[in-house]
């Protein structure tokens, strides 16, 4: 029998690992747009600003920590709202897709503009669709499936 904490931790870990792995593979390895280190430093720069890029390897690990903190927060939130959203109990894949899109909206239209007041304008292009797809597939869907497994014993 799974516990609430194990469910939230496992869904947060799965989402965090899948998301950062996809980001590094796609943006650093395949597209050569950046490096794994810069991806993680950019996460840390939300708090440490420009110092995140010059403070060395420790900022890479701090960025990774922030990344997982965010993943755990979204995993916890889905776990808490699951019993109150009837749709989540009906179709796990569509629930994950909708929650992944919700996460993308929260991060890109609320959190990032607050943390980084000057961001490039968003255009409906391949990069935008790719970023949405990564969050849906690597964060929303895994959180939905892991959380659903916990609640399956009640619904």
Predicted segments with their positions:
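Alpha-helical transmembrane segments of multipass membrane proteins
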Residues: 14-23, 70, 74, 99, ...
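Internal alpha-helical transmembrane segments of multi-pass membrane proteins
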Residues: 84-105
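Terminal transmembrane helical module of multi-pass membrane proteins
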Residues: 126-155
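Membrane-interface interhelical connector segments
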Residues: 30-56
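Hydrophobic alpha-helical transmembrane segments
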Residues: 61-79
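Interfacial helix-loop-helix junctions of multi-pass membrane proteins
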Residues: 53, 109-130
